[in-house]
């Protein structure tokens, strides 16, 4: 999810 998080920080939170 590194690429997605780069564009959308919110996705990183959901990924965790």
Curated annotation (Swiss-Prot):
Domain of life: Eukaryota
Main localization (coarse): secreted
GO molecular function annotation: metal ion binding
Keyword annotations: Apoplast, Manganese, Metal-binding, Secreted
Record's GO cellular component terms: apoplast
Localization per record: Secreted, Extracellular space, Apoplast
Subunit and interaction comment: Oligomer (believed to be a pentamer but probably hexamer).
Function: May play a role in plant defense. Probably has no oxalate oxidase activity even if the active site is conserved.
Family from the record: Belongs to the germin family.
Name of the protein in question: Germin-like protein 3
Species of provenance: Betula pendula
